Curated annotation (Swiss-Prot):
The keyword Repeat applies. The gene is fliI. It holds the Pfam family LRR_8. Gene3D superfamilies: Ribonuclease Inhibitor, Severin. Found in ovaries, larval fat bodies, brain and adult thorax. Residues 405-476 are annotated as: Disordered. This is Protein flightless-1.
Amino acid sequence: MSVLPFVRGVDFTKNDFSATFPSSMRQMSRVQWLTLDRTQLAEIPEELGHLQKLEHLSLNHNRLEKIFGELTELSCLRSLDLRHNQLKNSGIPPELFHLEELTTLDLSHNKLKEVPEGLERAKNLIVLNLSNNQIESIPTPLFIHLTDLLFLDLSHNRLETLPPQTRRLINLKTLDLSHNPLELFQLRQLPSLQSLEVLKMSGTQRTLLNFPTSIDSLANLCELDLSHNSLPKLPDCVYNVVTLVRLNLSDNELTELTAGVELWQRLESLNLSRNQLVALPAALCKLPKLRRLLVNDNKLNFEGIPSGIGKLGALEVFSAANNLLEMVPEGLCRCGALKQLNLSCNRLITLPDAIHLLEGLDQLDLRNNPELVMPPKPSEASKATSLEFYNIDFSLQTQLRLAGAAVPPSMPSSATPKDSTARKIRLRRGPRSEGDQDAAKVLKGMKDVAKDKDNEAGAVPEDGKPESLKPKRWDESLEKPQLDYSKFFEKDDGQLPGLTIWEIENFLPNKIEEVVHGKFYEGDCYIVLKTKFDDLGLLDWEIFFWIGNEATLDKRACAAIHAVNLRNFLGARCRTVREEQGDESEQFLSLFETEVIYIEGGRTATGFYTIEEMIHITRLYLVHAYGATIHLEPVAPAITSLDPRHAFVLDLGTHIYIWMGERSKNTLNSKARLMAEKISKTERKNKCEIQLERQGEESAEFWQGLGMTSEEADAAEPPKEHVPEDYQPVQPRLYQVQLGMGYLELPQVELPEQKLCHTLLNSKHVYILDCYTDLFVWFGKKSTRLVRAAAVKLSRELFNMMDRPDYALVMRVPEGNEMQIFRTKFAGWDEVMAVDFTRTAKSVAKTGANLTQWARQQETRTDLAALFMPRQSAMPLAEAEQLEEEWNYDLEMMEAFVLENKKFVRLPEEELGRFYTGECYVFLCRYCIPIEEPENGSEDGANPAADVSKSSANNQPEDEIQCVVYFWQGRNAGNMGWLTFTFTLQKKFKAMFGEELEVVRIFQQQENLKFMSHFKRKFIIHTGKRKDKAHTAKGKSPVEFFHLRSNGGALTTRLIQINPDAVHLNSTFCYILHVPFETEDDSQSGIVYVWIGSKACNEEAKLVQDIAEQMFNSPWVSLQILNEGDEPENFFWVALGGRKPYDTDAEYMNYTRLFRCSNERGYYTVAEKCADFCQDDLADDDIMILDNGEHVFLWMGPRCSEVEVKLAYKSAQVYIQHMRIKQPERPRKLFLTMKNKESRRFTKCFHGWSAFKVYL
């Protein structure tokens, strides 16, 4: 059955119908529009007379001289386009204008010398175009009858006047009289044309004497064209036309414009090119809607452009070429909407610096300015705020949402330093227009509503305490795979209430039409989506996948898989429900208004491979150059088609022969070989054999492929030159198949720059590419099945309409499996294969060769939740004492060893708890952990007395013995101690205690709480080694200075030796200062000061005294307790290097936090260190963020990456914004510090700061 009777419209543009016109056109009895442009028609085809329902006919750019006959029989014709032909008055029948439905007539660009006879009978005309003819006069009756005209174009004729009846055109909106000799005509009919919106009088010899002074009476006039006249100045009546939107005054003799231009408040386009203007009026800057200003070829200089031009906030195009400009005002760079700026052919010396801030500028023309020196670009640092950091949104609102925290209702803006560049950007934006102000009001209202919702959902507590992050549900914490669902579903799916159904075809979901909803094939599977609104007005979904009884395994599996993909695509929380044929749930059946209908068989094909014999048709292609690429043009597979100047490709399916003429170019030969390789790889699975054939050396198989033997080829005439030198293949025509309710349409796709690009192909549609010798039907992946079937039939009809050679074919091309012959018809389609030799082929196939472009399209994973977590609170003293008591109660025995002379020896009892930074210690701890006895009684109601008697009969359970070995390594100790322990002492311990032995390696100031509890807060760290007696440069015993401090609780109390300097004192802490005396017998005599700060707590004051008495328990040492302010000048301050200012409080201890920024997990994360952090937590490979409550430091390790630097910088900014909301009374400033360049404000946050450990 032919589909031509169902065709409603078709575009045959650029088809050659000069020889014969398709007779099958008669079958298109329902066609309503028909385009036959550029079809080389010399007369009206007879077949058009059968198209009785034709309403729109276009025949422009043909060779028509007469249109007698068939057109007059088209009673439904409403629009007729006959422009660009060779029509004369004698070739237009008067009967044509008897068509009552005719409303649009275009006879422009013909050879008419007068208005066609009988035109006045076409009383229903609303559009009439008679331009570009040779008409000398308009007959009086014409405008008496054509009073409904809306558009009238009489330009480019020889009219000297218009009839008085022109005033009857009261409905006329567009009147074009351009380029007519109307010097003696004053247009007195204008006041009657009150509906006129467009008036074009270009080249009508207007002067001040014959200018229509009544033009200001046209209340609806929007566009006025007065170009190409001899106006020395603009008449005053033009200034009074306040409704003007577009005004063209180019090619006149204007020397000035008055201040009256400010009346044109609606003006959007003003063309003043090619006049004698010296200056533009300042009132021009008062036109808020002006978008285009053209002042080319005038006499403007720097002073001629008003300085207030920056007020034109809507200006998009400014062109001032061929003037006398040496400089332009800086205000021009404040036009934020400027897109095109033309200053060519001037005398420019330089431009304002703000020219670089015009971010929306697309075109900048500065040619022919030989003395121009461009200003330097502003510093890139000023633009850092607008840079994107690896596709990560570092806004505080976004990061709070990702972390699961409540977004505060108000976000205060940070105080930023003044920036001249930013100020210029703000000035460039200019004042807001009325539309912007209205939009701002709407935006403010939306913000207020959002604030109210935020106050209800997650308001900040009144007590000011930081909120704890609510833990996510288990299903929310599951990581969703980063998949691109756009290949399966469209953006609009699930966004509107209703029912949407997909069928599974070739492993993929394919949306079906609404008319077949509720009709399921037994051999298919479907995905059903129900979209609705819930009680809160939010979208809600129900997802089902239906399984037919006869469906294949691949369809069943893919239905379930893509149902889950649909849920992930929508972000739905619902389940995907499985429905089987004959066992559907009531919920599923209620989705359909009628009963579900089962249809036998299957509508879609399985995705599994089916083995079938491939039938290859012998094709011979002519290889010809087309720009930088080549095209393969099919020719007849015969020896007569060969040309010695060209290369040919003979495709036999399993074999491809490259025939090279004796005078063919090597470039074409090599590209033909490359094309054959592509065909073999992409279409034949590399199983095709490629063979080169040179002229005169052809093989017998080659001639056999052309249907002849070698003897016949030798007897035949050799190939001759028959391909024309200027050979051009037929320009392909791309049609889009459109399907409606009972009709088909076949419009042509408009080609940008007349080039076929593969980007024109949309996956939702079906296209027909007509190349004359080949006709391709391209199926988009998302196109419907009905459109595909219609396209196949329509392509066959289109193929038969034209006289094509015998070797022409119709081929189907599915999206994603396009053949190379099809690809060569498009410019730049897969000419170069993506290759990156630094990565695997699988990686390149997944991301493409351009890894940077792929990365910009990805959503980078980050974890900044630690920045928004509340600070870890300090452990209360009572809880610390309880833990210390419990852990020491379980401790049955602890033996201590120290590395001495490459072996571990027992540590003297008096040195327990005293550590040295250059030593390694081993502690063997034996814990006796009691096993809790089961409670008496049972859940099943058994007799308790029986249980007691039973338990007494059995032996009591023994306590669990646990052995733990702690290996403590000082900061300055090498790894030799750990190796010695591993190969000696650890083996002995394992032999004694078996596999139950637990070994814990700990480093200085990174001890766990259980280990430190065994020393009962008397944990002392000395500098150096045990038996090395330190001496100063003068040979004296050095002064020892110890600092007592606890980080995050009493269990982390340490007494650490630091550099003796008064600057380290702090009124909140306690210190021990040992000043040795010089003696001849080398006895350890001296004086010990216990310095107690005025703000130190009583517990630490008592503790430091006990430690001092234990450390320096010698009759030769004097112990003194000093309160802050009672220090003796002689020994105390001299030992500390003199009196110096020091801190009087340690408020930072309540705010100090340390974060680590790293990429070690494969993505950027920020993790917080525990409150008991130390100097060794500063890793060289990472970046650390330190907050002391007053400053935020960004510490850079020497081996950190540039990526971490950028991301950590943005993270610190987000953290500061967050803390500004949480603690507005403590604003923080951001500082940068590097390793070995830390300031006192940074180092005071670390207990026992010293030189960094050197790694060998």
